[in-house]
Amino acid sequence: MTDVLPGSHAGTPEPELRLVLLGTIGCGKTLSGDTLLGQASSGSPFASGSSPRLCQLRRGASEGRRLTVVEAPRWYWNGGHMEAGVRKETERALELASPGPHAFLLLVPVGQFTEVERRVPTELEEVFGEGVLKHTLVLFTCGDYLMGRGAGQYLEGEDPGLREVIDRCGGQYHVINNRRPQEREQVRELLEKVTMTTIPSYNGNDNNGSN
């Protein structure tokens, strides 16, 4: 008997999405992975030999899709650039999301945009190639901090640099509240945005996508 994911139909191959979560310290990558997959991670990210300086790979099923979620290492900066060791490990995310991620999710906590985040799009192009921003969506975490405001209203009062980052990522953004992981509509909407705006997957060569 073939297992069928919730919300899917027997005989239909389940669509797969491969996502890479990127961001600085404290942006909420692990919690966002929990929310996306609808499951809690197994213990502390420091447990079982894991390290915040290494990529973490998780797989599961969510909202009728098979998900591969790669959590890139915490970003540490040396002057104006990412540390060499962290950059090398970040590059490994492409391998873990083989044949290539469908989207890079750039996590930015609500109300915590800094000069570091302003530099990230350029850094991503240096790490993954010029085509990466076409496959990047800004994911605002700590959505509860909006206190009922819409994302558009929030952006109007923020540093113009945040809008610039979003524009460089094709204008794509989404808000997630990891304090309410049971609200699955926020996950469905995010996965739909990824499906509509970033397919095919990215393998480091913008002229050679895969499925």
What label would you give each PLM region?
Residues 1-24, 56, 91, 205-207:
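Short, flexible boundary segments at extreme N-termini or domain junctions of P-loop NTPases and their
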Residues 1-4, 181, 195-211:
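Conserved P-loop small GTPase signature centered on TRAFAC-class small GTPases
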Residues 17-44:
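Glycine-rich phosphate-binding P-loop
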Residues 24-27, 63, 67, 74-75, ...:
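Conserved beta-strand elements of beta-rich interaction domains across eukaryotes
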Residues 38-66, 89:
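Switch I (effector-binding) loop of TRAFAC-class P-loop GTPase G-domains
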Residues 42-44, 66-89, 120-121:
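Switch II (G3) loop of P-loop NTPases
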Residues 88-168:
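Conserved C-terminal guanine-recognition region of P-loop GTPase G domains, centered on the G4
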Residues 148-200:
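Canonical P-loop GTPase G-domain recognition
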